[in-house]
Amino acid sequence: MDIVSIYRNLWGLIDGGFFLLAAALFFSGAFFAPIVVEKQIRPLLWYPLWIWKAIRRHVDPGAPFLRLWGLIFSLNSLSLFCNLVSGLFIVFPPLFAFLLGVHIAVICLKEVGNLRLFPLILNPVSLLELPAAWISLSLGMSLGREVYLRGYTIALSLFWRELTGYLFLVLPLLAVAALVEVSLIKALGNRPMANSGLGGGSGWE
């Protein structure tokens, strides 16, 4: 079996309906973020601001290229793996999709003072990371559906198949996205983008 056939089979793991649902929930969360900031809803502000401060503190634009790449890739890989595993808890993937939009938009609002939708989704890093995030969430939703309909025993057998999709679809997208992001950080001297560690996309600072 050639590589094209392998990837054609892998794409078959993605439920298109769940992929679109993940994207819709993400944007719903992003549009809800201004209310979160305006009303100072602390339970929804704490995590994105905490992790963003931690990333800014530990990511030095002057650090070696591979070190920056490894850090950004590792953080996003862990975040998106959690999206997949969350399917074992049925309702978590849709919740995570919504919160991902909230978290990234909150950081954008705090950093630049407004929510710029087009830079949020139409920059080189976002064009790679957002689909990766939605794929991981759709895999988690598929897993959650199996848990609900057939129970954990059947769902766990599906998990290993879904994990293949994560390894061969999600991780390559994240690897290239981290490469692009670090290249931009080095070229422009910027801090990391608001997507780092959250598994989604954002506008440049």
Task: Describe the residue ranges of each PLM region.
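Terminal transmembrane helical module of multi-pass membrane proteins
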Residues: 141-205
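Transmembrane alpha-helix/helix-exit interface in multi-pass inner-membrane proteins
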Residues: 35-42, 83-106
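Interfacial helix-start motif at the membrane-water boundary
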Residues: 56-86
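Alpha-helical transmembrane segments of helical membrane proteins, especially in multi-pass transport
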Residues: 121-145, 177
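Alpha-helical transmembrane segments of multipass membrane proteins
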Residues: 25, 29-33, 132, 173, ...
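N-terminal signal-anchor transmembrane alpha helix
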Residues: 9-45
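Residue-level signal for the membrane-embedded core of alpha-helical transmembrane segments
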Residues: 23, 92-95, 131-138, 167, ...
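Membrane-interface interhelical connector segments
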Residues: 39-63, 67, 104, 108-110, ...
